[in-house]
Design a protein with these regions (language model features):
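N-terminal Rossmann-like NAD(P) cofactor-binding subdomain of oxidoreductases
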Residues: 1-190, 225-227, 278, 285-287, ...
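Generic solvent-exposed, charged/amphipathic alpha-helical segments
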Residues: 17, 214-218, 259, 263
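Glycine-rich beta-alpha junction loops
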Residues: 36-38, 128-129, 153-160, 194-201, ...
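Helix-loop-beta segment of a Rossmann-like dinucleotide-binding subdomain
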Residues: 117-124, 193-204, 310-312
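A glycine-rich, Thr/Ser-enriched phosphate-binding loop motif common to dinucleotide/cofactor-binding enzymes
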Residues: 121-132, 205-214, 320-324
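Active-site-proximal catalytic alpha-helix in oxidoreductases
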Residues: 167, 188-196, 238-243, 247
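Oxyanion-binding "anion nests"
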Residues: 191-238
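C-terminal active-site/capping subdomain that shapes the small-molecule cofactor and substrate pocket
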Residues: 226-335
Length: 335
């Protein structure tokens, strides 16, 4: 299978490369592309050193698939042209997610969206914070139905890419030197701070990250009227996103019934030890491909409640981006 990674030197592109290293796809002929600025860099793949080349449209000719993680503007400009060459494009940006007819896919959750996929299709990779939430909630949706979701996120700086990682590192260093931190990526310092909004804020006070979570969840679950209330927050963590989620199910359930429904679901790891030392944290799970769920509970002092609360953690560069994209590629490569 001839595969191109566009944006190979970025935070997600590097993880795509790492996930392809362990992929189920038996024979891979891989080409790496990035901007002119990053061209010439070498990256390892299956024991070889591979040169990253400057992207140009003609270099996509003859590819079977393109894993794209080069930002929304680039994707809007190039993805359709690449797909028109007969190349299947799996795009990690937000550019195509809500476009009618473009599959928005989490393989464990809505694999039916990949049925009948033909070469030359654009497939959208959902938002990182959306992916981990829908994986955790899908078995509950199937078992009990879902009427409403409340989610507050604690999102790491790697969600902004390498520049977010560097800004946090530089600001921490500056503060320890008693220097004023410079803000180039975020509007306020992120070091030792919490920023209560991600991306552009609209006239109604909703930020774009929240809009993504609401609309993508509805599309993936096939429930266009589902009530989703989201508050997205940037925190001074390098890698992995966390979420506090409350979900109103279609019926009252016990903690035990919820755990039974979630147990064994693909890509989901339940942490049932409720001691503080056992809780999954961003630091503990960084680099892992699973979605981790803990603190599963029903509301305090409320009997027969349809509400369920939980803590969800996943690596935003892995399952939240690269791993999900490679899983999509694995699924379509078997057609």
């Amino acid at each position: 299978m001839k595969i191109a990674i566009v944006g190979a030197t970025g935070a997600v592109g590097r993880e795509m490369l790492a996930d392809l290293e362990d992929s189920k796809i038996p024979e891979i002929s891989l080409s790496l592309f990035a901007s002119q600025r990053s061209a010439g860099e070498s990256l390892p793949f299956r024991g070889k050193s591979m040169e990253v080349k400057a992207f140009s449209l003609d270099k996509m000719q003859g590819m079977d698939a393109c894993l794209m993680s080069a930002g929304g503007a680039f994707s809007r400009q190039s993805a359709k042209a690449i797909a028109d060459m007969g190349v299947t494009v799996i795009d990690n940006s937000s550019a195509w997610r809500m476009v009618e007819g473009v599959p928005l896919v989490v393989p464990e959750v809505n694999p039916e969206a990949l049925r009948g996929i033909k070469k030359g299709t654009i497939i959208a990779n959902p938002n990182c914070s959306t992916i981990q939430m829908v994986v955790a909630l899908k078995p509950l949706l199937d078992a009990f139905g879902i009427e409403q979701i409340h989610v507050s996120t604690y999102q790491s700086v790697s969600g902004t890419g390498q520049r977010g990682i560097k800004e946090l590192a530089h600001q921490v260093e500056s503060l320890f030197r008693f220097q004023e931190p410079k803000c180039e990526v975020y509007a306020q310092p992120i070091a030792f701070n919490v920023l209560p909004g991600i991306d552009v804020v609209d006239s109604q006070g909703h930020c774009f990250e929240e809009e993504k979570m609401v609309r993508e969840t509805r599309k993936i679950f096939g429930k266009p009227d589902l009530s989703v209330l989201a508050t997205t927050v940037r925190v001074p963590v390098y890698q992995a996103h966390s979420e506090a989620v409350s979900v109103k199910l279609g019926k009252a359930v016990t903690r035990e019934e919820a755990i039974k429904a979630m147990s064994g679901f693909a890509g989901l790891k339940l942490h049932l030890d409720d001691s503080h030392a056992a809780f999954p944290t961003p630091r503990a799970i960084a680099g892992d491909r699973a979605v981790h769920v803990a603190r599963i509970r029903t509301p305090i002092d409320v009997l027969n409640s349809p509400w369920l609360q939980m803590w969800i953690v996943a690596d935003n560069l892995k399952k939240g981006a690269a791993t999900n994209a490679v899983q999509i590629l694995e699924a379509i490569s078997y057609h």
